[in-house]
Protein backbone atom coordinates (compact mmCIF):
# COMPACT_ATOMS: atom_id res chain seq x y z
CA UNK A 1 0.00 0.00 0.00
CA UNK A 2 1.12 3.53 -0.67
CA UNK A 3 1.73 5.88 2.23
CA UNK A 4 2.26 9.59 2.55
CA UNK A 5 5.79 9.26 1.20
CA UNK A 6 4.54 7.99 -2.16
CA UNK A 7 2.15 10.93 -2.35
CA UNK A 8 4.97 13.39 -1.72
CA UNK A 9 7.18 11.70 -4.33
CA UNK A 10 4.43 11.79 -6.94
CA UNK A 11 3.40 15.38 -6.27
CA UNK A 12 7.00 16.39 -5.61
CA UNK A 13 7.88 15.78 -9.27
CA UNK A 14 5.16 18.21 -10.33
CA UNK A 15 6.27 20.76 -7.76
CA UNK A 16 9.88 20.60 -8.94
CA UNK A 17 8.75 21.34 -12.50
CA UNK A 18 6.48 24.14 -11.33
CA UNK A 19 9.22 25.69 -9.19
CA UNK A 20 11.77 25.51 -12.01
CA UNK A 21 9.51 27.30 -14.50
CA UNK A 22 8.24 29.77 -11.89
CA UNK A 23 11.75 30.91 -10.91
CA UNK A 24 12.81 31.20 -14.56
CA UNK A 25 9.77 33.33 -15.36
CA UNK A 26 10.37 35.60 -12.35
CA UNK A 27 13.96 36.12 -13.46
CA UNK A 28 12.83 36.98 -17.00
CA UNK A 29 10.19 39.48 -15.84
CA UNK A 30 12.64 41.17 -13.47
CA UNK A 31 15.08 41.51 -16.39
CA UNK A 32 12.27 43.34 -18.21
CA UNK A 33 12.05 45.88 -15.37
CA UNK A 34 9.43 44.47 -13.02
CA UNK A 35 10.11 44.37 -9.27
CA UNK A 36 10.49 40.96 -7.65
CA UNK A 37 7.08 41.31 -5.97
CA UNK A 38 5.42 42.21 -9.29
CA UNK A 39 7.23 39.40 -11.10
CA UNK A 40 6.04 36.83 -8.57
CA UNK A 41 2.44 37.90 -9.15
CA UNK A 42 2.69 38.21 -12.93
CA UNK A 43 4.66 35.07 -13.75
CA UNK A 44 2.60 33.17 -16.38
CA UNK A 45 2.64 29.93 -14.42
CA UNK A 46 1.30 31.75 -11.33
CA UNK A 47 -1.42 33.41 -13.40
CA UNK A 48 -2.38 29.97 -14.72
CA UNK A 49 -2.54 28.62 -11.17
CA UNK A 50 -4.77 31.52 -10.13
CA UNK A 51 -7.01 30.89 -13.14
CA UNK A 52 -7.32 27.24 -12.10
CA UNK A 53 -8.37 28.35 -8.61
CA UNK A 54 -11.08 30.56 -10.12
CA UNK A 55 -12.28 27.63 -12.23
CA UNK A 56 -12.22 25.33 -9.19
CA UNK A 57 -14.37 27.71 -7.15
CA UNK A 58 -16.72 27.96 -10.16
CA UNK A 59 -16.87 24.12 -10.23
CA UNK A 60 -15.38 23.83 -13.72
CA UNK A 61 -15.83 20.08 -14.50
CA UNK A 62 -12.32 19.47 -15.85
CA UNK A 63 -10.48 21.34 -13.09
CA UNK A 64 -12.71 19.92 -10.36
CA UNK A 65 -12.17 16.38 -11.63
CA UNK A 66 -8.39 16.88 -11.64
CA UNK A 67 -8.57 18.29 -8.10
CA UNK A 68 -10.57 15.28 -6.89
CA UNK A 69 -8.04 12.88 -8.44
CA UNK A 70 -5.06 14.59 -6.82
CA UNK A 71 -6.85 14.89 -3.48
CA UNK A 72 -7.59 11.18 -3.69
CA UNK A 73 -3.87 10.50 -3.82
CA UNK A 74 -3.31 12.68 -0.76
CA UNK A 75 -6.10 11.16 1.33
CA UNK A 76 -5.01 7.65 0.38
CA UNK A 77 -1.48 8.42 1.52
CA UNK A 78 -2.68 10.09 4.70
CA UNK A 79 -4.81 7.07 5.61
CA UNK A 80 -1.95 4.60 5.19
CA UNK A 81 0.52 6.68 7.20
CA UNK A 82 -1.93 7.55 9.97
CA UNK A 83 -2.91 3.88 10.27
CA UNK A 84 0.75 2.92 10.69
CA UNK A 85 1.02 5.46 13.52
CA UNK A 86 -2.22 4.31 15.16
CA UNK A 87 -3.89 7.68 14.55
CA UNK A 88 -7.55 8.20 13.69
CA UNK A 89 -10.02 11.07 13.76
CA UNK A 90 -13.65 11.34 14.89
CA UNK A 91 -14.41 14.09 12.38
CA UNK A 92 -12.47 15.62 9.49
CA UNK A 93 -13.29 19.09 8.16
CA UNK A 94 -12.18 19.94 4.64
CA UNK A 95 -11.52 23.52 3.57
CA UNK A 96 -13.34 22.74 0.33
CA UNK A 97 -16.48 22.32 2.46
CA UNK A 98 -16.09 25.53 4.48
CA UNK A 99 -14.62 28.19 2.15
CA UNK A 100 -18.09 29.31 0.98
CA UNK A 101 -19.08 29.84 4.61
CA UNK A 102 -15.86 31.81 5.02
CA UNK A 103 -16.85 34.00 2.06
CA UNK A 104 -20.25 34.66 3.62
CA UNK A 105 -18.50 35.76 6.83
CA UNK A 106 -16.40 38.17 4.77
CA UNK A 107 -19.59 39.60 3.26
CA UNK A 108 -20.99 39.90 6.79
CA UNK A 109 -17.86 41.81 7.83
CA UNK A 110 -18.29 44.21 4.89
CA UNK A 111 -21.90 44.90 5.89
CA UNK A 112 -20.83 45.56 9.49
CA UNK A 113 -18.02 47.86 8.39
CA UNK A 114 -15.40 45.60 9.96
CA UNK A 115 -13.76 44.95 6.57
CA UNK A 116 -13.22 47.25 3.61
CA UNK A 117 -12.96 46.80 -0.14
CA UNK A 118 -10.02 48.15 -2.14
CA UNK A 119 -10.27 49.54 -5.70
CA UNK A 120 -9.11 46.19 -7.12
CA UNK A 121 -12.17 44.60 -5.45
CA UNK A 122 -10.11 42.70 -2.85
CA UNK A 123 -11.38 42.67 0.76
CA UNK A 124 -9.14 43.55 3.72
CA UNK A 125 -9.21 44.22 7.45
CA UNK A 126 -7.00 46.89 9.02
CA UNK A 127 -5.53 45.61 12.30
CA UNK A 128 -2.79 48.22 12.66
CA UNK A 129 -4.55 49.78 15.66
CA UNK A 130 -4.24 46.37 17.34
CA UNK A 131 -0.51 46.13 16.69
CA UNK A 132 -0.90 43.85 13.67
CA UNK A 133 -0.96 44.50 9.90
CA UNK A 134 -3.62 44.81 7.24
CA UNK A 135 -4.86 41.37 6.25
CA UNK A 136 -6.24 40.15 2.92
CA UNK A 137 -9.50 38.20 3.30
CA UNK A 138 -10.69 37.88 -0.29
CA UNK A 139 -8.78 38.37 -3.56
CA UNK A 140 -9.89 40.87 -6.15
CA UNK A 141 -11.20 38.09 -8.40
CA UNK A 142 -13.36 36.83 -5.54
CA UNK A 143 -11.32 33.72 -4.72
CA UNK A 144 -10.62 32.79 -1.12
CA UNK A 145 -7.36 32.77 0.84
CA UNK A 146 -6.27 30.70 3.86
CA UNK A 147 -7.89 33.14 6.28
CA UNK A 148 -11.22 32.93 4.44
CA UNK A 149 -11.20 29.16 4.76
CA UNK A 150 -10.10 29.19 8.40
CA UNK A 151 -12.89 31.60 9.32
CA UNK A 152 -15.44 29.26 7.76
CA UNK A 153 -13.92 26.17 9.35
CA UNK A 154 -13.78 27.75 12.82
CA UNK A 155 -17.42 28.83 12.53
CA UNK A 156 -18.53 25.38 11.38
CA UNK A 157 -16.64 23.58 14.16
CA UNK A 158 -18.15 25.71 16.91
CA UNK A 159 -21.64 25.44 15.40
CA UNK A 160 -21.48 21.67 14.92
CA UNK A 161 -19.96 20.69 18.25
CA UNK A 162 -20.95 23.35 20.81
CA UNK A 163 -17.31 23.43 21.93
CA UNK A 164 -16.07 24.76 25.25
CA UNK A 165 -12.60 25.20 23.77
CA UNK A 166 -10.92 24.60 20.43
CA UNK A 167 -7.21 23.85 20.23
CA UNK A 168 -5.25 24.26 17.01
CA UNK A 169 -2.09 22.12 17.05
CA UNK A 170 -0.07 23.89 14.38
CA UNK A 171 3.61 24.81 13.97
CA UNK A 172 5.07 28.03 15.34
CA UNK A 173 5.44 29.56 11.88
CA UNK A 174 1.65 30.12 12.03
CA UNK A 175 1.66 32.09 15.31
CA UNK A 176 0.76 35.35 13.57
CA UNK A 177 -1.97 33.71 11.48
CA UNK A 178 -3.84 32.54 14.57
CA UNK A 179 -3.50 35.91 16.29
CA UNK A 180 -5.26 37.37 13.27
CA UNK A 181 -7.91 34.62 13.13
CA UNK A 182 -8.92 35.16 16.76
CA UNK A 183 -9.00 38.94 16.37
CA UNK A 184 -11.06 38.82 13.16
CA UNK A 185 -13.63 36.52 14.78
CA UNK A 186 -13.82 38.85 17.76
CA UNK A 187 -14.38 41.92 15.57
CA UNK A 188 -17.10 40.04 13.69
CA UNK A 189 -18.93 39.63 17.00
CA UNK A 190 -17.89 36.09 17.87
CA UNK A 191 -15.89 36.90 21.02
CA UNK A 192 -17.47 33.94 22.83
CA UNK A 193 -15.70 31.73 20.31
CA UNK A 194 -12.46 33.63 19.76
CA UNK A 195 -11.80 33.78 23.51
CA UNK A 196 -11.93 29.98 23.58
CA UNK A 197 -9.49 29.31 20.75
CA UNK A 198 -6.00 28.19 21.74
CA UNK A 199 -3.13 27.85 19.30
CA UNK A 200 -0.88 25.10 20.67
CA UNK A 201 2.22 26.20 18.81
CA UNK A 202 4.97 23.63 18.39
CA UNK A 203 8.57 23.90 17.28
CA UNK A 204 10.10 22.13 14.33
CA UNK A 205 11.56 18.63 14.52
CA UNK A 206 15.05 18.43 13.09
CA UNK A 207 17.03 15.38 12.03
CA UNK A 208 20.82 15.25 11.69
CA UNK A 209 20.18 15.65 7.94
CA UNK A 210 18.01 18.76 8.34
CA UNK A 211 14.62 20.16 9.24
CA UNK A 212 11.28 18.42 8.86
CA UNK A 213 8.97 21.06 7.40
CA UNK A 214 5.83 20.31 5.45
CA UNK A 215 5.81 23.32 3.10
CA UNK A 216 9.48 23.33 2.11
CA UNK A 217 11.74 21.04 0.15
CA UNK A 218 13.41 19.86 3.35
CA UNK A 219 10.51 17.60 4.33
CA UNK A 220 11.42 14.15 5.64
CA UNK A 221 9.43 11.21 4.27
CA UNK A 222 7.24 10.00 7.16
CA UNK A 223 6.90 6.48 5.74
CA UNK A 224 10.64 6.11 5.27
CA UNK A 225 11.26 7.37 8.81
CA UNK A 226 8.76 4.89 10.26
CA UNK A 227 10.30 2.01 8.28
CA UNK A 228 13.80 3.02 9.40
CA UNK A 229 12.69 3.21 13.04
CA UNK A 230 11.14 -0.27 12.93
CA UNK A 231 14.22 -1.72 11.20
CA UNK A 232 16.56 -0.07 13.72
CA UNK A 233 14.41 -1.32 16.60
CA UNK A 234 14.60 -4.85 15.19
CA UNK A 235 18.37 -4.65 14.81
CA UNK A 236 19.07 -3.21 18.27
CA UNK A 237 16.56 -5.49 20.03
CA UNK A 238 18.15 -8.55 18.39
CA UNK A 239 21.66 -7.40 19.35
CA UNK A 240 20.58 -7.16 23.00
CA UNK A 241 18.86 -10.55 22.93
CA UNK A 242 15.42 -9.10 23.57
CA UNK A 243 13.87 -11.10 20.72
CA UNK A 244 15.47 -14.46 21.59
CA UNK A 245 12.26 -16.01 22.92
CA UNK A 246 9.99 -14.48 20.27
CA UNK A 247 8.51 -16.16 17.23
CA UNK A 248 8.95 -14.35 13.89
CA UNK A 249 5.45 -12.92 14.21
CA UNK A 250 6.10 -11.76 17.77
CA UNK A 251 9.48 -10.28 16.77
CA UNK A 252 7.82 -8.26 14.00
CA UNK A 253 5.12 -7.03 16.37
CA UNK A 254 7.62 -6.07 19.08
CA UNK A 255 9.92 -4.33 16.58
CA UNK A 256 7.03 -2.27 15.25
CA UNK A 257 5.87 -1.43 18.77
CA UNK A 258 9.36 -0.44 19.89
CA UNK A 259 10.18 1.53 16.73
CA UNK A 260 6.98 3.56 16.85
CA UNK A 261 7.21 3.90 20.63
CA UNK A 262 10.73 5.27 20.32
CA UNK A 263 9.65 7.79 17.68
CA UNK A 264 6.58 9.02 19.54
CA UNK A 265 8.16 9.16 22.99
CA UNK A 266 11.30 10.97 21.84
CA UNK A 267 9.13 13.71 20.33
CA UNK A 268 6.48 13.85 23.07
CA UNK A 269 8.93 13.98 25.98
CA UNK A 270 10.04 17.43 24.80
CA UNK A 271 7.97 20.56 25.45
CA UNK A 272 6.08 20.97 22.15
CA UNK A 273 6.98 24.65 21.93
CA UNK A 274 10.68 23.86 21.61
CA UNK A 275 12.55 22.98 18.44
CA UNK A 276 14.16 19.58 18.90
CA UNK A 277 16.80 17.41 17.26
CA UNK A 278 15.59 13.86 16.68
CA UNK A 279 18.26 11.15 16.64
CA UNK A 280 16.75 7.78 15.57
CA UNK A 281 19.39 5.56 17.19
CA UNK A 282 19.46 7.53 20.43
CA UNK A 283 15.68 7.22 20.66
CA UNK A 284 15.95 3.39 20.78
CA UNK A 285 18.50 3.28 23.62
CA UNK A 286 17.13 0.71 26.10
CA UNK A 287 18.97 2.38 28.99
CA UNK A 288 18.06 6.05 28.61
CA UNK A 289 15.03 8.31 28.81
CA UNK A 290 13.38 6.57 25.88
CA UNK A 291 10.20 4.79 24.92
CA UNK A 292 11.96 1.39 24.62
CA UNK A 293 13.33 1.69 28.19
CA UNK A 294 9.81 2.21 29.51
CA UNK A 295 8.40 -0.52 27.25
CA UNK A 296 11.06 -2.95 28.43
CA UNK A 297 10.28 -2.14 32.07
CA UNK A 298 6.62 -2.97 31.44
CA UNK A 299 7.52 -6.23 29.69
CA UNK A 300 9.88 -7.09 32.55
CA UNK A 301 7.11 -6.66 35.14
CA UNK A 302 4.71 -8.71 33.01
CA UNK A 303 7.32 -11.48 32.92
CA UNK A 304 7.58 -11.44 36.73
CA UNK A 305 3.81 -11.66 37.13
CA UNK A 306 3.58 -14.39 34.50
CA UNK A 307 6.22 -16.48 36.26
CA UNK A 308 4.42 -16.03 39.57
CA UNK A 309 1.18 -17.30 38.06
CA UNK A 310 2.96 -20.24 36.42
CA UNK A 311 4.47 -21.11 39.82
CA UNK A 312 1.00 -21.22 41.36
CA UNK A 313 1.48 -18.09 43.48
CA UNK A 314 -1.83 -16.39 44.26
CA UNK A 315 -1.44 -12.62 44.62
CA UNK A 316 -5.02 -11.64 43.83
CA UNK A 317 -5.92 -10.55 47.37
CA UNK A 318 -4.44 -7.71 49.42
CA UNK A 319 -2.34 -8.71 52.43
CA UNK A 320 -0.85 -7.10 55.52
CA UNK A 321 2.88 -6.60 55.08
CA UNK A 322 5.67 -4.30 56.17
CA UNK A 323 6.76 -1.84 53.50
CA UNK A 324 10.35 -0.83 52.96
CA UNK A 325 11.08 2.90 52.43
CA UNK A 326 11.63 2.23 48.70
CA UNK A 327 8.23 0.55 48.48
CA UNK A 328 6.55 3.45 50.24
CA UNK A 329 8.23 5.79 47.77
CA UNK A 330 6.86 3.73 44.86
CA UNK A 331 3.35 3.90 46.33
CA UNK A 332 3.68 7.68 46.71
CA UNK A 333 4.78 8.00 43.09
CA UNK A 334 1.81 5.91 41.96
CA UNK A 335 -0.61 8.16 43.84
CA UNK A 336 0.72 11.18 41.92
CA UNK A 337 -0.52 9.84 38.58
CA UNK A 338 -3.98 11.51 38.55
CA UNK A 339 -2.52 14.94 39.36
CA UNK A 340 0.17 14.47 36.69
CA UNK A 341 -2.48 13.73 34.06
CA UNK A 342 -4.50 16.75 35.20
CA UNK A 343 -1.45 19.01 34.97
CA UNK A 344 -0.62 17.70 31.50
CA UNK A 345 -4.16 18.45 30.35
CA UNK A 346 -4.30 21.92 31.87
CA UNK A 347 -0.99 22.91 30.30
CA UNK A 348 -1.37 21.03 26.98
CA UNK A 349 1.90 19.28 27.86
CA UNK A 350 2.16 15.54 27.14
CA UNK A 351 5.83 15.85 28.11
CA UNK A 352 4.68 15.97 31.76
CA UNK A 353 3.25 12.46 31.42
CA UNK A 354 6.38 11.28 29.60
CA UNK A 355 8.63 12.55 32.39
CA UNK A 356 6.45 10.94 35.06
CA UNK A 357 6.28 7.52 33.40
CA UNK A 358 10.04 7.53 32.82
CA UNK A 359 10.74 8.38 36.47
CA UNK A 360 8.33 5.65 37.60
CA UNK A 361 10.03 3.08 35.36
CA UNK A 362 13.47 4.17 36.53
CA UNK A 363 12.35 4.06 40.17
CA UNK A 364 10.97 0.53 39.79
CA UNK A 365 14.12 -0.72 38.07
CA UNK A 366 16.25 0.63 40.91
CA UNK A 367 13.99 -1.03 43.45
CA UNK A 368 13.95 -4.36 41.61
CA UNK A 369 17.75 -4.31 41.31
CA UNK A 370 18.03 -4.26 45.11
CA UNK A 371 15.06 -6.37 46.20
CA UNK A 372 13.84 -9.78 45.09
CA UNK A 373 10.19 -10.35 44.32
CA UNK A 374 9.71 -13.96 43.23
CA UNK A 375 12.47 -15.26 45.51
CA UNK A 376 11.19 -13.43 48.59
CA UNK A 377 10.64 -16.11 51.26
CA UNK A 378 7.96 -14.33 53.28
CA UNK A 379 4.66 -15.07 51.52
CA UNK A 380 2.91 -11.85 52.60
CA UNK A 381 5.85 -9.69 51.52
CA UNK A 382 6.08 -11.53 48.19
CA UNK A 383 2.37 -11.02 47.54
CA UNK A 384 2.63 -7.32 48.40
CA UNK A 385 5.58 -6.89 46.04
CA UNK A 386 3.82 -8.69 43.21
CA UNK A 387 0.75 -6.50 43.64
CA UNK A 388 2.91 -3.38 43.82
CA UNK A 389 4.73 -4.40 40.63
CA UNK A 390 1.38 -4.99 38.97
CA UNK A 391 0.23 -1.47 39.87
CA UNK A 392 3.45 -0.01 38.46
CA UNK A 393 2.85 -1.87 35.18
CA UNK A 394 -0.78 -0.71 35.08
CA UNK A 395 0.17 2.97 35.51
CA UNK A 396 2.99 2.69 32.96
CA UNK A 397 0.53 1.15 30.51
CA UNK A 398 -2.06 3.87 31.10
CA UNK A 399 0.45 6.70 30.86
CA UNK A 400 1.96 5.39 27.65
CA UNK A 401 -1.52 4.84 26.24
CA UNK A 402 -2.25 8.54 26.77
CA UNK A 403 0.84 9.24 24.66
CA UNK A 404 -0.43 6.89 21.94
CA UNK A 405 2.30 4.34 22.67
CA UNK A 406 1.71 0.59 23.00
CA UNK A 407 3.68 -1.44 25.54
CA UNK A 408 4.55 -5.12 24.98
CA UNK A 409 3.95 -7.88 27.52
CA UNK A 410 6.95 -9.82 26.22
CA UNK A 411 10.35 -8.62 25.13
Name each model feature, range by range.
Residues 1, 5-411:
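Non-catalytic interaction-recognition regions
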Amino acid sequence: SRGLGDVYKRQGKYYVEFDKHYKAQIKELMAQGQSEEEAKKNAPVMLEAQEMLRKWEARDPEVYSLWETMNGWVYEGFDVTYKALGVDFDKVYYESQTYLLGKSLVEEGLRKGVFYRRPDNSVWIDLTADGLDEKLLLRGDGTSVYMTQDLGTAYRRFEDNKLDDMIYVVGNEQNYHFQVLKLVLKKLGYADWSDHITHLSYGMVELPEGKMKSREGTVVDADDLIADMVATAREMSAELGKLDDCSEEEANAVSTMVGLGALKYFILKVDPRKTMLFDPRESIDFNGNTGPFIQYTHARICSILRKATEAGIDFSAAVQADYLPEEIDLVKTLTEYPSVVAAAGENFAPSVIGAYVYELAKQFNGYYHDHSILREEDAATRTMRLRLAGQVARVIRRGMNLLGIDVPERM
